[in-house]
């Protein structure tokens, strides 16, 4: 959320059609996550249907469902429908909150980019190529040459790793080192 204003501005530079408008949808859309082995059954009971494979999108009356992986589906629900959708899902599954969803994102290898870490990494440093977050065959985008060169040379200066730390978390973007791994 702290990178949203800058991201909207940057994306706005690439809008080439007058009918395309970028805007902050935080007051219009509510994000809900459904996860676990019962996620598909909960969505069937909700009546949304289930996107068939990773990153497939399915629109339904109250919003949109995006399949993130085998057991995680994100719903972008119209704000006026969020409470009824939440109540129905809560009757079908156990609500666990944002910390549990963040843990699932970490377990899936999804990087969390903040203002402190924005523009600090090429996609390979954040492991985006490992989770299908970057294509080396489609599109044209700023920095594509560097991303492709990194891929084909096979040299990534640093990588993102999952770690479990005791005590307080260091600030975002802090380099961590292990004496066992030079």
Predicted regions and their residues:
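Basic, glycine/lysine-rich polyanion-binding surfaces/domains
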Residues: 1-182
